[in-house]
Every structure is written in structure tokens, then in C-alpha cells.
Design a protein with these regions (language model features):
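Alpha-helical transmembrane segments of multi-pass small-molecule/ion transporters
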Residues: 1-304
């Protein structure tokens, strides 16, 4: 019953999103507005509160150090494969980052609580060191005329990144403790906590609304998704093996690493397409891997 209490609300939210699209209760523009509200105004406070209490120990540093070469190798392989086998301009973006924002953080909050979201936030910031350069390279030749400087600036000024760094700074410096002493800290926590409430339901609704698996290029979609899954599985085994060597590793760190490795490719990938074929293909890959994520989530919820 405990598992059902976790899983059923998720399936209901996703199902409502799918129903809303099928019955045309909302337009894509309206759903996009919901996503932008959550990404810009709700998830940043979650990360802020979580990072305030974050403890950056050996295990956190270990996951950061491990993740960088893993994503670097997969990205380099993707660029090479793009030349020889998969001639899709945005192909490398499918291997440069996982979707921590729209799905990783909400699922992490549901499983482990908002106070542990910083663990996923650390992985999100770490993957940015690889995904941002890959995004710049891919976006520089989309044919849409988006300047590289503009793209980099947009990523670096992301509310999620800014609020995460602010939370770390206030927490680790001890400044938040001083604000707590004069009563200001409590007001900040209550305000940010209130803003964070819609995150899980809104984002899961959006996932259901945007789910798409076109019959066009279905074999190619399954093949690329399978490759992505194998890369993620190998990365998970390596990272879990290294964490095994680190003394006194918190079990939550292992679970969050496992959850991260099951996440789909970044939902930014379709937006970097040069044509409809690339958009359909990458959207299909992301949607298929999202199904894998939700199945994995149920397994993690049952055993964590």
C-alpha cells in the first residue's frame, strides 16, 4: 500500500496531462506557460532550501568527479557517431545531459523529500560543465541564428543555478544562521517553501501532456533509446562501484545516483533540431526514455 500511495498520484497527474491534450482542454502554449512558471519560480526555491542544508562531503565530491568523465565520454562518442551512423544535428545533446529539471528534481522530492533535493542539484550543476559546451556547439549551427553568447548567458543566468549557488553560499558561510537568529531566516524558508508546493504535480502533468511516440522512424527511436539506456546503465554501475569504495556513504546518495542514471535525455534536445525529422526523432527518444524512468521510479520507490 505504501508503494501505491507514492505511485498512484504520479500516474494520475500524468494521466490527467495526457487526457488534457487528447480532449484539447489546454493548448500547448498554455501547458508551456505552466512549465515555465514551475521552472523559473517553483523549482529554484526548492533547490535554495535544499542547498541551505546541504552537506558537501566526500561522497558528493566523488559523484561530481565521476560524472564528468562519464558524460564527457558519452558526448564524444555521440559526436563521432553523428559523423558515421546517426546524421542528426542535435544527436550529441541526447548523451550530454539527463533531464534533471523537469523530471529528476520532482521525482527526487517525491521519493526522498525536498530537503534532499540538493543531491540531485549537485548532479545537475556538474552535468552543466559538459552539457553547456555541447549545447553551444550544437546550437551554433541550428540555422536559427541564435548567438552562442546569448545561449551561454541564458544558461548561466538560470534561476535554478543562481538559487542553488545562493543556497550553498548562505548555508556554508553561516550567514543563514545569523538570519535565523533575527527571525528573517524563517520568513525566507516559509516563502520559498510555499512557492515550491506546485512542483511535482505541475511537472508530471506536463510530462503526460507532452508525451509523444511517433510511428515515424520508430525503429531508429528504439535503437537510439536503447543505446542511451546502455550508456546510463554502464555509468550507474561504475559510479555505484566507486561509491562502494568511499567509507560511510549515505544510502540516499546511492539512490539518487541510481535515479539520475534512469532519467531521460535532456528535453532541450528536440529544441535544437534543424528540421522536423530531427525534432520527431529526439522527442520520441525522450518520451520512450521517460517511460523507462517512470518504471524505474516505481522500483526505487518499492525498495528505497
Amino acid at each position: 500500500m505504501a508503494l501505491l500511495q507514492t505511485v498512484v498520484p504520479i500516474l494520475v497527474c500524468i494521466g490527467l496531462g495526457f487526457l488534457a491534450r487528447k480532449k484539447e482542454l489546454l493548448t500547448p502554449e498554455q501547458t508551456g506557460g505552466i512549465q515555465q512558471f514551475v521552472l523559473k519560480f517553483c523549482i529554484p526555491p526548492v533547490l535554495f532550501n535544499s542547498c541551505l542544508e546541504a552537506k558537501i562531503g566526500a561522497e558528493s565530491l566523488t559523484t561530481m568527479v565521476m560524472l564528468l568523465p562519464v558524460l564527457l565520454l558519452s558526448s564524444l562518442w555521440a559526436f563521432r557517431a553523428r559523423k558515421k551512423r546517426y546524421p542528426y544535428h542535435n544527436f550529441p545533446m541526447l548523451f550530454a545531459a539527463h533531464e534533471t529539471g523537469m523530471i529528476g528534481l520532482p521525482l527526487c522530492i517525491i521519493l526522498f523529500g525536498a530537503s534532499e533535493a540538493y543531491r540531485m542539484g549537485i548532479l545537475d550543476m556538474t552535468q552543466g560543465l559538459i552539457s553547456i559546451p555541447v549545447m553551444v556547439i550544437v546550437a551554433s549551427d541550428t540555422g536559427k541564428g541564435a548567438p552562442i553568447k546569448t545561449i551561454v548567458k541564458k544558461v548561466l543566468l538560470s534561476p535554478m543555478l543562481i538559487m542553488s549557488l545562493l543556497g550553498f553560499a548562505l548555508g556554508l558561510s553561516g550567514l543563514m544562521a545569523r538570519l535565523d537568529a533575527v527571525g528573517v531566516g524563517g520568513i525566507i524558508r516559509q516563502t520559498t517553501g510555499f512557492l515550491a508546493q506546485p512542483v511535482s504535480a505541475a511537472m508530471l502533468f506536463s510530462i503526460g501532456f507532452n508525451f509523444s511516440l511517433s510511428s515515424e522512424n520508430r525503429n531508429e527511436i528504439f535503437k537510439i533509446a536503447g543505446i542511451g539506456f546502455l550508456f546510463s546503465a554502464a555509468a550507474c554501475l561504475v559510479m555505484q562501484g566507486v561509491l562502494f569504495l568511499v567509507p560511510n556513504v549515505d544510502a540516499l546518495t546511492r539512490w539518487v545516483v541510481l535515479l539520475y542514471c534512469t532519467l531521460p535525455a535532456s528535453y532541450l534536445a528536440p529544441s535544437l533540431s534543424r528540421n522536423n525529422k530531427e525534432s520527431v526523432l529526439t522527442s520520441g527518444v525522450c518520451s520512450l526514455l521517460t517511460v523507462v524512468t517512470l518504471i524505474s521510479f516505481c522500483v526505487i520507490a518499492a525498495f528505497s
